[in-house]
Amino acid sequence: DAEHSPNTPLSVFVETYKKVIGEIKKLGKIPVILNLPPVDARKYFRWVSNGVNGDNIMKWLGGDEIYIYRWHEMYNAAICDLSNSMKIPMIDIRSAFLVKRDYSDYLCEDGIHPNERGHKLIKDTLVDAIKAVLPGRTAADVNG
């Protein structure tokens, strides 16, 4: 019944992001941020409840494992808000996952970290974004 908090509370996540952005700007560079890949709440629930009482975790989640997705979405929304409020360019990698028929195929067994296919999807999305802002570049130039 105890309240459980994430390892990194949202406020700490946002402040850390702001500090990193500030440090990049101090170096005279232009920061570019990425939004988050989606989480597969069911896989993540299975992963975190492995070897512990999943019923207790489910009770804390209010009986809804999709709560994990919504919680994760708050962190993604915070990144989008930072991009808007600080006028920082953001590359949308999340949509690259979400348009896939089953984006879970691009995540590790833990349901939260990209697997090899997921990392390739992120790389391809980044290459496309870079080519869009650096016209005339080839994939070889960008992949360097």
Which residues are covered by each model-predicted region?
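Alpha-helical cap/lid subdomain in secreted, periplasmic
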Residues: 1-144
